Amino acid sequence: MAMVPSGSGGGPPVIAEVEMNGGADSGAATVRATVVQASTVFYDTPATLDKAERLIEEAAGYGSQLVVFPEAFVGGYPRGSTFGFGANISIGNPKDKGKEEFRKYHAAAIEVPGPEVTRLAAMAGKYKVFLVMGVIEREGYTLYCSVLFFDPLGRYLGKHRKLMPTALERIIWGFGDGSTIPVYDTPLGKIGALICWENKMPLLRTALYGKGIEIYCAPTADSRQVWQASMTHIALEGGCFVLSANQFCRRKDYPPPPEYVFSGLGEEPSPDTVVCPGGSVIISPSGEVLAGPNYEGEALITADLDLGEIVRAKFDFDVVGHYARPEVLSLVVNDQPHLPVSFTSAAEKTTAAKSDSTAKPY
């Protein structure tokens, strides 16, 4: 594993961990992929996008064709905040300070599509990479934790909205539905993503396996050692490469108190306290760790993916193929959007009435 210092200026060096095609099948395609381990510039979306571009440029300089960012990189993951609810959630209004905190968080989120999405698409096109970006999406007054996909031609492909926020995330994020569980068939392979603890949902994983996912992206906020076991299991279960990207951040990467206060930790952490140590990792379909996990700092974690490894792994175990028993166990996925309000146009109502001769008056 080669350790390549970052050439970007400002701040501590970013380290790229690169597995240089060791043991790859020369008869199969190889994809160089990078997972980004870096912190949001909290409450400052333009600065976060500037940082993202520097990191994408650097990864592209190493020859990376696919770049995966952490959960909520654009918009931020609100570590330590309870948005005014305190330790105990109760019926009623949170404190005014919590409401103001949510207003700021809402302002830092992005609309999809929107100008920030246009800029991210331009980055993907400029540096000729497939880009998988974790964002906080704003739709009206509701926020969603989402992943956006872009291709090297500078096109926005689509998104995945987190189906099930975890714990206090449910206070601030809405719930996705089955209409945004995409797997994109790209020249690099079939690429999709689930976010953080969604990856613990067996049926949701199976939906991706059913779509033939080959490069499984797992943006996360979970830095615990046990997360590595989950990532290894998914690689083995799905016969796919798993790319998990998490932020590395210190207290000083968030606004200082009293603007932003870390709750539930007993006392306010010092500026240099690590509040998320990362753990980003790349794992092969055979369960081999190709790069990472890194717990040391901001990093570009890069490996060459030998796509021939997928076929070799599927020979042992194909969860939606020769190892499936659909006459006993099967999965039905509702992939229709679920909207709280739907309108039928007057023209549609008229057409429907004319086509139904048995329609009753109302």
UniProtKB/Swiss-Prot annotation:
- The active-site annotation reads 71, 162, 196
Highest taxon in the source lineage: Eukaryota
Q: Extract the SUPFAM superfamilies matched here.
A: Carbon-nitrogen hydrolase
Any idea where the CN hydrolase domain is? 31-307
Kindly list the biological process annotations in GO that this record carries: detoxification of nitrogen compound
What keywords are annotated for this sequence in UniProt? Hydrolase
One function term, GO molecular function aspect: nitrile hydratase activity
Q: What is its EC number?
A: 3.5.5.1, 3.5.5.4
Q: Which reaction does it catalyse?
A: a nitrile + 2 H2O = a carboxylate + NH4(+); 3-cyano-L-alanine + 2 H2O = L-aspartate + NH4(+)
What is this protein for, i.e. what is its function? Highly specific for beta-cyano-L-alanine (Ala(CN)). Low activity with 3-phenylpropionitrile (PPN). Not associated with auxin production but may be involved in cyanide detoxification.
* Record-stated family: Belongs to the carbon-nitrogen hydrolase superfamily. Nitrilase family.
What protein name is recorded for this chain?
Bifunctional nitrilase/nitrile hydratase NIT4
Q: Which organism is it from?
A: Oryza sativa subsp. japonica (Rice)
Q: What is the lineage of its organism?
A: Eukaryota, Viridiplantae, Streptophyta, Embryophyta, Tracheophyta
